[in-house]
């Protein structure tokens, strides 16, 4: 399981194929790279007093490990939650749903493209029912908005 040691944290979690940002279907996802997304996230989080932990993985189990670790940090009051772009796992992963639900990790599901303006199979999300919010179709700016939302969120 990953270890995290600093205070106050926010996890930026990216799923499969997001390592290809900037070159994969730019008409759908734009020309920004994953490094650009990371820079935007850090630039947004730093003035809010947040430390970003940025992760991209093409492997479901690795994403689950980070969700588990951050769920524990949130319970300890050391993290606010996660901005999570699950990529194609959005539409297929009961395991990610169960990890978020089981840990209580506050997640804002984030998509660069408007998944509802795309193929019908992309219209269903297994994550949305356990997310505290969903942002879609606003490009990489959605990550910044999600960070701001977590920073200003009042826990239930």
Residue ranges and their predicted role:
Residues 6-11:
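Extreme N-terminal starter segment of soluble prokaryotic enzymes
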Residues 16-18, 87-90, 113-115:
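Short glycine-rich anion-binding loops that position phosphate/pyrophosphate groups of nucleotides
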Residues 27-46:
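Short catalytic helix/loop segments, enriched in acidic residues and glycine
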Residues 51-61:
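Short beta->alpha junction loops
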Residues 70-82:
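Short acidic/histidine-rich motifs immediately flanking catalytic phosphotransfer sites
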Residues 91-105:
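Short Gly/Thr/Asp-enriched flexible loops that form oxyanion-binding sites at enzyme active sites
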Residues 101-118:
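Short, acidic/small-residue loops that bind anionic groups at enzyme active sites
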Residues 136-156:
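A charged, well-structured terminal subsegment
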């Amino acid at each position: 399981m990953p270890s995290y040691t600093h205070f106050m944290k926010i996890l930026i979690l990216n799923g499969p194929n997001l390592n290809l940002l900037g070159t994969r279907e730019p008409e759908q996802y734009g020309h920004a790279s994953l490094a650009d997304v990371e820079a935007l996230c850090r630039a947004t989080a730093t003035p809010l007093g947040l430390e970003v932990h940025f992760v991209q993985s093409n492997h479901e189990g690795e994403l689950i490990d980070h969700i588990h670790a951050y769920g524990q940090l949130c319970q300890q009051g050391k993290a606010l939650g996660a901005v999570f772009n699950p990529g194609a796992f959005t539409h297929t992963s009961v395991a990610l749903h169960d990890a978020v639900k089981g840990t209580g990790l506050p997640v804002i599901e984030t998509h660069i493209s408007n998944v509802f303006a795309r193929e019908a199979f992309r219209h269903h999300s297994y994550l949305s029912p356990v997310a505290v919010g969903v942002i879609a179709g606003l490009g990489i700016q959605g990550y910044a908005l999600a960070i701001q939302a977590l920073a200003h969120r009042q826990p239930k």
